[in-house]
Amino acid sequence: MDLSARENIYLNGALLGYSKDFINEHFDEIVEFAEVEKFLDMPLKNYSSGMVSRIAFAIATVIVPEILVVDEVLSVGDFMFQKKCENRITQLIEEHGVTVLIVSHSNEQIARLCNKAIWIEKGHTRLIGDAHDVALVYGGLGGRTGSKQSEDYVFQALVNSTAVHDASKCRVIGADSTCATGAKLVFESFGAEKIHNFVLAVDNTHINAIVGNGLAGALHAPLLSTGGVDRLADSSRNVLFEMKPDAIYLLDISGVAPAVFDELKNLPWQPDVQKIGEDDTRTEFSKKVFKCGLDRSLWGSSLAYIDFSDNAEAFAAAPFCYKHGIPVLMPEVSEDGSGMVEECAKAINARTVYEFGDNGVNAVETTNLNDSCHITCIGSSGRADSCFEISRYVYEDFDQLGPSGFVCFTSLNNFQWPELQTCGSYCSMISAPLFLMDDRSLDNESRCLSFLNDNKDNIESILIIGDKNGLDTLDQQLLASALA
């Protein structure tokens, strides 16, 4: 490494069988490609690994070989030079028919440059075939954890998805913004139906939508986010002008949207506008929404209790609560919600209290309820498993009412939540459960895929909620393949 770059070019050339005359003839070409003109006389030991690789690649490709082996060379160096090397490789393949063997950990690079690929793991061939298909399967497992059994299941599902999947089995419902996605869901689920009531949830917090979901169901009303606290988003405003509801309920737990309330009061057809919430705690807000339904004799004989830490579970339960018009109670983090449950249960002579998720069980089970009231706890340890159990419960409940042929899927990722505020009403209207899939967990993915496969005779289509923040194309293809 004490040699200069100039000397190293001749040494490497000799090791590759190039004569000194050959190197002399192509020296300028090698230096120009490697872009090291200013550093030729610098000791190679002072070069970065990327600069060393530049020289090695330039020397190796100065001729047109029969076989070119590129072993991780493209993993170092800057992006522009990597692109330059890829262009040289493509030229050798397309213009000269050179066989190129690339050893790389870059999934995208293999799919881009190769037509065949071998996935070698721990010295053994795990998969061989079309480069795009191998890269897809490799990428589908990358970054995801789970049991060996789940990994094998998802691996085989990924392999199958490259061979057989019906794209028509999977449809994405999304738009440019979260509010626009919600508007699209409202139009798809209610269509031209005359709407008498409408529930708007101020979207500074998803609590408004979660707690208001049962009220919207009892009113048979669309639920949509406002899209802001200073004014209605254009998409939300357009929905209101299209449907012209007689009454609008604005849910604003924090009392941060007086401007939206004023905007609603000034709508040209002059709907009755009621605002619920004013710098409330979650317990206070839950009680206010409950009282609103109680005063209108909307509630049946069921309650739903969801702990604040079970937010994802609340979205999974939303279609069920909407379908049956069940009031949703959510306490403060520091509060024991048993008192609120007991008070509301007595007010409607509750026969069933549903506890969704794993964190509110103690509060519900310690509530002093009458003997005729049944407690149903639906959930599991771990957010992903808990959401799955709730969604499966909803599927079975809806199936008893008559299968619709639809299931909805979305991502468990927190970034997806703003798009899910309207999902309770949408999924309920089409009688579809909402599965929140954790695309980082092989265990959860395998459970979702197994569920689809077990029920494929009754499922016509998978509806993917959300676009930019939702499940990616690979996940969509994987889900669709489970129905094949």
Each predicted region: which residue ranges?
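Conserved ABC ATPase "signature" region
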Residues: 10, 22-39, 58
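A short, proline-enriched helix->beta-strand linker immediately N-terminal to the Walker B motif
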Residues: 61-70, 76
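Helical segment within the ABC ATPase nucleotide-binding domain
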Residues: 82-95
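Conserved H-loop
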Residues: 98-103, 106-112
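H-loop (His-switch) and adjacent beta-strand-loop-beta switch element
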Residues: 113-130, 138
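Extracellular glycan-binding segments that recognize GlcNAc-based cell-wall polysaccharides
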Residues: 151-484
